[in-house]
Amino acid sequence: MIFYTLEHILTHISFSLVSIGITIFLITLSVDEIIGLYDSSEKGVIGTFLCITGLLVTRWAYSGHFPLSNLYESLLFLSWSFAIIHMFPYFKKQNSYVRTITSSSTIFTQGLVTSGLLSEMQQSEILVPALQSQWLMMHVSMMVLGYAALLCGSLLSVALLVITFRKALRIFSKKKAFLKDSFSFVEIQYRNEPSNVLLSTSFISSKNYYRAQLIQQLDRWSSRIISLGFIFLTIGILSGAVWANEAWGSYWNWDPKETWAFITWTMFAIYLHTRTNPNFQSVNSAIVAFLGFIIIWICYFGVNLLGIGLHSYGSFNLH
């Protein structure tokens, strides 16, 4: 009873922090100058992390097993994983764009957990026989950590694509405007003002330099985080295969969850392969990561909607 009450309190605190965090996050998206608000949002993520840690420990204590037996608990662990990834750049006081991705991921995932959509799964139950194994912690935790890292890395790649294509569209529109107005009186007058041209060129060059630096940093950090996630995912799949052989007598059964996990692994293996070729780095590899981002959500969330296969104990119904 004490553990249940504590979990209830931590859930409400977490929900309050998430609500405040989402509000602050949306405000900082429109008003970049309010630095104090952004810092408050980041501290809110740390508070949410502590609450999630307390939730997981409390749930583990009164259920008697590691809390990764259904979608609700795995989403809790996913939020916790996002927060862990968030801690590294936060305490080093660098890479604010990485922290923006991880903090927003933590806030919105935890918001989904506390939204009430998964209320039927919040009550801890006795594990089904297939899950009563020491492999539960190893397999599921590695898979969820892998998903968290891959999602964060993929979102950095998405940010890279947005910046790159916005730049391409801007250049294209400027070329059209130049062709349209190249013989106008305003253009001729502008050409007669060399000082303005020099100032404008200097500003554009500086802006392009910082944009190029940002794209390069996004590309580098995306590659690092995805590489880490790929390692976690590989360990998770291998440990799951060993567990499946013990539980069902076969290392691989090609049920929907296993199939999409393999597709996810293959997609990010392709991503890492493209990184070995300098001609396919940056934008091309980011496109692969974006496709991987979609596939992860199909594997992690979409397959659970089917409620079929050997992993059907993690399914849920929206009603």
Swiss-Prot record:
Source taxon at top rank: Eukaryota
Positions of disulphide bridges: none
What interactions and quaternary structure are annotated?
A: May interact with Ccs1.
* A GO BP annotation: cytochrome complex assembly
Q: What is this protein called?
A: Cytochrome c biogenesis protein CcsA
Lineage, opening ranks: Eukaryota, Viridiplantae, Streptophyta, Embryophyta, Tracheophyta
A Gene Ontology cellular-component term: plasma membrane
Molecular functions per Gene Ontology: heme binding
Summary of the function given for this chain in its UniProt record: Required during biogenesis of c-type cytochromes (cytochrome c6 and cytochrome f) at the step of heme attachment.
InterPro entries according to UniProt: Cyt_c_assembly, Cyt_c_biogenesis_CcsA, Cyt_c_biogenesis_CcsA/CcmC
Locate the transmembrane regions by residue number.
9-29, 44-64, 71-91, 143-163, 225-245, 259-273, 286-306
**Chief place of localization:** plastid
Please provide the record's keywords in A-Z order.
Answer: Chloroplast, Cytochrome c-type biogenesis, Membrane, Plastid, Thylakoid, Transmembrane, Transmembrane helix
Which family is this sequence assigned to? Belongs to the CcmF/CycK/Ccl1/NrfE/CcsA family.
How does this protein lie in the membrane?
A: Multi-pass membrane protein
Q: Where in the cell is it found?
A: Plastid, Chloroplast thylakoid membrane
